[in-house]
């Protein structure tokens, strides 16, 4: 009865007094076994079983027992739903509706049958049956069967009628009827009792609800909360809820070790323990009066908290270290705590010193009083040291916190361990310092102790503590003895103890610090260990040094100082997280690849998850032609070259891919791929490639289209791919949107290949190549004389030569680099042009144009080079050219119409002239043909403002004009026998005239006496290499010279193409580049003394210039007649510098770099008498005005 809840007890008290004398509680499980219900069992539900009371008459009792047996049997047959108990929130148990009505209705009809199935209680009385009926009718609204319908079978769904009150007196009835009458009476009484209990229930439930709210709130603090740590500990929120149910079912006041209450209590105790462990030693050692009120209050409060903690430890669950089980049973908790730390915690929690003082004050013995002063003080201090045993509790709490931090953050766990170790060392130093002073104090400061020797017995406690701590740390760190070495025996033993403790703590600190440092950068440590193994492997196999260096460079670029097991790390992650990490790692690759930018995001994710990272070094062959392809590669960073057997090369850079052709055709590699730089690639195996493309057929068609385009660019065909793409196009597989996407991918791929080639070609121009002057020694023995001339020495050792002379020929995809060049001295160039325009003698300028070498030109002619009509004068022929001579009539201007025809043989000239040009369909030799005269000899039209003097290059390729020459120009003829031309110009049998011809100015420059008009030339425009679109036509005007003749230059740059930036060279260090045909011809012509020389002309430098000026200008043609001393003249005033027969020109052995002016245009020098407008927009000068200092000119020896 004591275990029942109050509401149940009130219900039992409200029963009739003759009923309920003996009752006991039975579990629902036992009820089910006895009644044969077999239903669901709930341990929280209880049922009441009452002993039968003695019945008034045996017959009635027998009949009632039969009826009861029948009713119980019918109830058992109705299943578990009807016989199960009904439990409310306050713990009372009730039957389900209809169960008792069925018992009453079936009592009479099935008495005999129910008697056999009764539970053995044959002596149950009518009072017990009435109690059960009353229990079933306790709640209002429950069904009851009227007495008149007791024997009728129960109709489902029939409305229940309340039982009518029976009359007070009734005649005797049969047994069944007599059994029903007491039931009805009992029901009336129980209803009245139930009404009385319902009036009492609300007040009790309100009080119970108020107390239940506080209990629930406090109970929630004792249970584990749903937070980050509990979720990490138990795995899920459902597991946390199950743990909360465990705490509820364990009993009252069971505290979970991971509950919020225990967390804050442990934090409070931790701070209190630290304060105790610091303050108590200082108070015991340095303060003699310990009975002050603050000290007593502090100790009492501390002891009270520790005693409360001792009690709470008996109700706190214990975490088993072997597994994750948490003990919540109070009996197991008590036994486990008593066997472990109870004794230490109890001794450190009880105030032993105060108990001793209380006992001591009650003893009044005189002998005791006389000797108690010192003894009490000493013993009390020793007993107070028992509180220091709380250190064990501090260590346990810190260990728990370390576990918490270790489960959440690994780095925080390492830091917490280091902080704990440092704090523990400082605490031991603090204790050791107090002990160093406590021992002499307990000995009453003997004369040989360190306190007496240093005279600190009566000093302040701060000074005493400072020196004691210094002495203790000196011992513990093993660096000394403090102020002096120990003298007394007690000091010696204390010193040894300090050294042992200090050495142990120091070793622990070093070990923990090393472990922390290693754990902070484990990946770098792993890389260093791995590379040590690699070094030992290289030493064991005795690899050569260059191989070792390559291995070292590979490891540096591949792992970059950190090594991870990336496959295992990603394999342990979930698939969405793995895809997110891979997408982040490959974000640069996706951003730079047009294929991925235009593709389905699902395709990109599927592709990226199957990629494998690889690194290749410069010179590594990633793919070799003819091998079976098993991978394709995506370039994240780097440049590779696609090589074929035809030596046709293609560059691929960041964002491109290669190796997909054999994966698509299941064939062999069609080209080799070599890494030009360090390449960071992602590889895709053939199985993964086909697996991905099966899901995305549009991307397969994109790969096939790009592969066909690439094969076409390197000059190869693949019938399988071509057939597949053609079949897709004919079958209409491509819709408009897919076709647009594929075309965009192909266009981006072409652009990337073009950009990669340009970048690589520009980078290859940076190294210092072979000088131009030494190329003829290898290519043509006929040109060997050029190396011995002063011009060769001057050009080779000159530090300021333009970079265009030493640059290699541009590649097929390089394009017009002249457009992007920047002039080094633009203002100097603008100031030199008007000066040259007003000079009497022409000024020459070095050529800034890239020209092909003589060997390449010779190969083109041997291979059957057929020049267009406009270029026929460039190739001397024995049948088509008349004898060389000079034409005195000026050429006529030629109209230009642009064409798009390309000429492979003239591609180098086109690139030399600056990129994509447009030319005229009329022959270029119109102004160059012998005997061509201009009908407009008197009226020179103004030259085009945008004209560039790029044809100065062609001037040195022209054969000598016919023999008709003007009188004014014949004394200044410059000649070279055709037989002495370089092999690059020998296209056929050279013409050998009887007398050695003298090359004169070309016909387009020779109209001097007639005041010939300048002629604009438009070279061929379709001469650009593949990939270049023709640009607007460019015209090249020919300026009319004076009577003395207008002379071309040795090195002729286009005026609109500024010199590229060049790397300064040291004097005497020749830059190394391939040679140029132009330079070879000029140098040979300059080194052949074909004409008699009248006298030696010396090169005179008028004024020095800074080394920033580009190059010296050399006058190729002489100045005939008497000339005024205008700027640009080389000799004394009035002395012509013509090539007089019998005269030799002596060249200086050294040419100063300061005497070289910036390059000038081909037609930058005009005669003073020319009336035509200037060629440039620079301001004009008077012919006699000296705008620039006189420069030294190198006259030709021809």
Swiss-Prot record:
Biased composition (Acidic residues): 26-36
Sequence positions bearing Phosphoserine: 139, 1103, 1106
Record region (Involved in subunit assembly): 209-260
GO terms for MF: cAMP binding; identical protein binding; intracellularly cAMP-activated cation channel activity; potassium channel activity; voltage-gated potassium channel activity; voltage-gated potassium channel activity involved in SA node cell action potential depolarization; voltage-gated sodium channel activity
GO BP: cellular response to aldosterone; cellular response to cAMP; cellular response to cGMP; in utero embryonic development; membrane depolarization during SA node cell action potential; modulation of chemical synaptic transmission; monoatomic cation transport; potassium ion import across plasma membrane
UniProt membrane topology term: Multi-pass membrane protein
Low complexity biased stretches: 831-856, 866-880, 895-905, 913-937, 965-985, 1043-1054
Cytoplasmic side: 1-266, 315-340, 390-420, 518-1198
Compositionally biased tracts (Basic and acidic residues): 121-132
Catalytic activity line of the entry: K(+)(in) = K(+)(out); Na(+)(in) = Na(+)(out)
Compartments where found: Cell membrane
InterPro entries referenced in this protein's UniProt entry, alphabetically: cNMP-bd_CS, cNMP-bd_dom, cNMP-bd_dom_sf, Ion_trans_dom, Ion_trans_N, K/Na_HCN_channel, K_chnl_volt-dep_EAG/ELK/ERG, RmlC-like_jellyroll
Stretches within the membrane that do not traverse it: 465-486
PTM text: S-palmitoylated.
Keyword line: cAMP, cAMP-binding, Cell membrane, Glycoprotein, Ion channel, Ion transport, Ligand-gated ion channel, Membrane, Nucleotide-binding, Phosphoprotein, Potassium, Potassium channel, Potassium transport, Sodium, Sodium channel, Sodium transport, Transmembrane, Transmembrane helix, Transport, Voltage-gated channel
Entries under PROSITE patterns matching the protein: CNMP_BINDING_1 (PS00888), CNMP_BINDING_3 (PS50042)
Regulation: Activated by cAMP and at 100 times higher concentrationsand to a lesser extent by cGMP and cCMP. cAMP binding causes a conformation change that leads to the assembly of an active tetramer and channel opening. Binding of cAMP removes a tonic inhibition conferred by cyclic nucleotide-binding domain (CNBD) on channel opening. Cyclic dinucleotides can modulate HCN4 channel; cyclic dinucleotides acting as potent antagonists of cAMP. Inhibited by extracellular Cs(+) ions. Auxiliary subunits can also regulate HCN4 channel.
GO CC annotation: axon; basolateral plasma membrane; dendrite; HCN channel complex; neuronal cell body; perinuclear region of cytoplasm; plasma membrane; terminal bouton
Chain intervals with Gly residues compositional bias: 105-118, 1120-1132
Purpose: Hyperpolarization-activated ion channel that are permeable to Na(+) and K(+) ions with very slow activation and inactivation. Exhibits higher selectivity for K(+) over Na(+) ions. Contributes to the native pacemaker currents in heart (If) that regulate the rhythm of heart beat. Contributes to the native pacemaker currents in neurons (Ih). May mediate responses to sour stimuli.
The record's note on its domains: Contains six transmembrane segments (S1-S6) and an intervening P-loop. The segment S4 is the voltage-sensor and is characterized by a series of positively charged amino acids at every third position, while the S5-S6 segments together with the P-loop form a centrally located pore of the channel. Contains a cyclic nucleotide-binding domain (CNBD) in their C-terminal region. The CNBD is connected to the pore forming transmembrane segment via the C-linker.
Name recorded for this polypeptide: Potassium/sodium hyperpolarization-activated cyclic nucleotide-gated channel 4
Source organism: Rattus norvegicus (Rat)
Lineage: Eukaryota, Metazoa, Chordata, Craniata, Vertebrata
């Amino acid at each position: 009865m004591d275990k029942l809840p109050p509401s149940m007890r009130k219900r039992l008290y409200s029963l009739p007094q003759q009923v309920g004398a003996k009752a006991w509680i039975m579990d629902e499980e036992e009820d089910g076994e006895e009644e044969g219900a077999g239903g669901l069992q709930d341990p929280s539900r209880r049922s009441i079983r009452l002993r039968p009371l003695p019945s008034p008459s045996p017959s009635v009792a027998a009949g009632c027992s039969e009826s009861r047996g029948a009713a119980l049997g019918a109830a058992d047959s109705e299943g578990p739903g009807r016989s199960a108990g009904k439990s409310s929130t306050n713990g009372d148990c009730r039957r389900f509706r209809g169960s008792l009505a069925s018992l009453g209705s079936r009592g009479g009809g099935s008495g005999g049958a129910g008697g056999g199935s009764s539970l053995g209680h044959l002596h149950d009385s009518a009072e017990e049956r009435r109690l059960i009926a009353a229990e079933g009718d306790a709640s209002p609204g429950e069904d009851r069967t009227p007495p008149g319908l007791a024997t009728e079978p129960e109709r489902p769904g029939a409305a229940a009628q309340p039982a009518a009150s029976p009359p007070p007196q009734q005649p005797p009835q049969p047994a069944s009827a007599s059994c029903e009458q007491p039931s009805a009476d009992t029901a009336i009484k129980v209803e009245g009792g139930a009404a009385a209990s319902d009036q009492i229930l609300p007040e009790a439930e309100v009080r119970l609800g108020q107390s239940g709210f506080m209990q629930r709130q406090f109970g929630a603090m004792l249970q584990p909360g749903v937070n980050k740590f509990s979720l990490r500990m138990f795995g899920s929120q459902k597991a946390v809820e199950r743990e909360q149910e465990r705490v509820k079912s364990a009993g009252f006041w069971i505290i979970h070790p991971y509950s919020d209450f225990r967390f804050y209590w442990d934090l409070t105790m931790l701070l209190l323990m630290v304060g105790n462990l610091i303050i108590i030693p200082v108070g015991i050692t340095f303060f003699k009066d310990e009975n002050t009120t603050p000290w007593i209050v502090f100790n009492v409060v501390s002891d009270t908290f520790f005693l409360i903690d001792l009690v709470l430890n008996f109700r706190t669950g214990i975490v088993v270290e072997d597994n994750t089980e948490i003990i919540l049973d109070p009996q197991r908790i008590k036994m486990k705590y008593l066997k472990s730390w109870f004794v230490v915690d109890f001794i450190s929690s009880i105030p032993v010193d105060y108990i001793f003082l209380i006992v001591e004050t009650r003893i009044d013995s005189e002998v005791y009083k006389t000797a108690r002063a010192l003894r009490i003080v000493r013993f009390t201090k020793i007993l107070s040291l028992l509180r220091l045993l709380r250190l064990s509790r501090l260590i346990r709490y810190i260990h728990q916190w370390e576990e918490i931090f270790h489960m959440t953050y690994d780095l925080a766990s390492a830091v917490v361990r280091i902080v704990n170790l440092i704090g523990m060392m400082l605490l031991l130093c603090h204790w050791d310092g107090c002990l160093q002073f406590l021992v002499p104090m307990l000995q009453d400061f003997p004369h040989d102790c360190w306190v007496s020797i240093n005279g600190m017995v009566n000093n302040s406690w701060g000074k005493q503590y400072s020196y004691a701590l210094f002495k203790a740390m000196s011992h513990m760190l093993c660096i000394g003895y403090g102020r002096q070495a120990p003298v007394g025996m007690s000091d010696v033993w204390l010193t040894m103890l300090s050294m042992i403790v200090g050495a142990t703590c120091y070793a622990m600190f070093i070990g923990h610090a090393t472990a922390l440092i290693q754990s902070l950068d484990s990946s770098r440590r792993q890389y260093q260990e791995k590379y040590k193994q690699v070094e030992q492997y290289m030493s064991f196999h005795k690899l050569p040094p260059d191989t070792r260096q390559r291995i070292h460079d590979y490891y540096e670029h591949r792992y970059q100082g950190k090594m991870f097991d990336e496959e295992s790390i990603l394999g342990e992650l979930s698939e969405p997280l793995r895809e997110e990490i891979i997408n982040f790692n490959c974000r640069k690759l996706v951003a730079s690849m047009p294929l991925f930018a235009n593709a389905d995001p699902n395709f990109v994710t599927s592709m990226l998850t199957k990629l494998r990272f690889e690194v290749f070094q410069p010179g590594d062959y990633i793919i070799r032609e003819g091998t079976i392809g098993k991978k394709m590669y995506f370039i994240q960073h780097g440049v590779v070259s696609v090589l074929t057997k035809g030596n046709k090369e293609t560059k691929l850079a960041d964002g491109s891919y290669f190796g997909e052709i054999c994966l698509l055709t299941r064939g062999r590699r069609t080209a080799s791929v070599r890494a030009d730089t360090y390449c960071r690639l992602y590889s895709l195996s053939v199985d993964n490639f086909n697996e991905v493309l099966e899901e995305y057929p549009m991307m397969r068609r994109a790969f096939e289209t790009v592969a066909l385009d690439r094969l076409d660019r390197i000059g190869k065909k693949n019938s399988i791919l071509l057939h597949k793409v053609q079949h897709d196009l004919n079958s209409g597989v491509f819709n408009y949107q897919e076709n647009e996407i594929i075309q965009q991918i192909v266009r981006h791929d072409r652009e990337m290949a073009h950009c990669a080639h340009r970048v690589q070609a520009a980078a290859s121009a940076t190294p210092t190549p072979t000088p131009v002057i030494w190329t003829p020694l290898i290519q043509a023995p006929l040109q060997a004389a050029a190396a011995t001339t002063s011009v060769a020495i001057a050009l080779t050792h000159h530090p300021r030569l333009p970079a265009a002379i030493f640059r290699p020929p541009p590649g097929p995809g390089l394009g017009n680099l002249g457009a992007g060049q920047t002039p080094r001295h633009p203002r100097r160039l603008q100031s030199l042009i008007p000066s040259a325009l007003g000079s009497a003698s022409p000024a020459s300028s070095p050529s800034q144009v890239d020209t092909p070498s003589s060997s390449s030109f010779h190969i083109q002619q041997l291979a059957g080079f057929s020049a267009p009509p406009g270029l026929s004068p460039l190739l001397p022929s024995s049948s088509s050219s008349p004898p060389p001579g000079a034409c005195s009539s000026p050429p006529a201007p030629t109209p230009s119409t642009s064409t798009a025809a390309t000429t492979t043989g003239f591609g180098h000239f086109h690139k030399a002239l600056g990129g994509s040009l447009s030319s005229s369909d009329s022959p270029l030799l119109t102004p160059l043909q012998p005997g061509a005269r201009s009908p407009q000899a008197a009226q020179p039209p103004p030259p085009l403002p945008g004209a560039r003097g790029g044809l100065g290059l062609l001037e040195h390729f022209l054969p000598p004009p016919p023999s008709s020459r003007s009188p004014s120009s014949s004394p200044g003829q410059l000649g070279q026998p055709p037989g002495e031309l370089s092999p690059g110009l020998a296209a056929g049998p050279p013409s050998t005239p009887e007398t050695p011809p003298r090359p004169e100015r070309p016909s387009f420059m020779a109209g001097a006496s007639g005041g010939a008009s300048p002629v604009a030339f438009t070279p061929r425009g379709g001469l650009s290499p593949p990939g270049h679109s023709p640009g607007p036509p460019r015209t090249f005007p020919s300026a009319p010279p004076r009577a003395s003749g207008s002379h071309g230059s040795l090195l002729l740059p286009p005026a609109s193409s500024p010199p590229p930036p060049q790397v300064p060279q040291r004097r005497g260090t020749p830059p190394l580049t391939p040679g140029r045909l132009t330079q070879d011809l000029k140098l040979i012509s300059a080194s052949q003394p074909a004409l008699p020389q009248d006298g030696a002309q010396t090169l005179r430098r008028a004024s020095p210039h800074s080394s920033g000026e580009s190059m010296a200008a050399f006058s190729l043609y002489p100045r005939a007649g008497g000339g005024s001393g205008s700027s640009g003249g080389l000799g004394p005033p009035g002395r012509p510098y013509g090539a007089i027969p019998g005269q030799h020109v002596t060249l200086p052995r050294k040419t100063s770099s300061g005497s070289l002016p910036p390059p000038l245009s081909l037609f930058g020098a005009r005669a003073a008498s020319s009336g035509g407008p200037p060629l440039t927009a620079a301001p004009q000068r008077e012919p006699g005005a000296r705008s620039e200092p006189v420069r030294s000119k190198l006259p030709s020896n021809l």
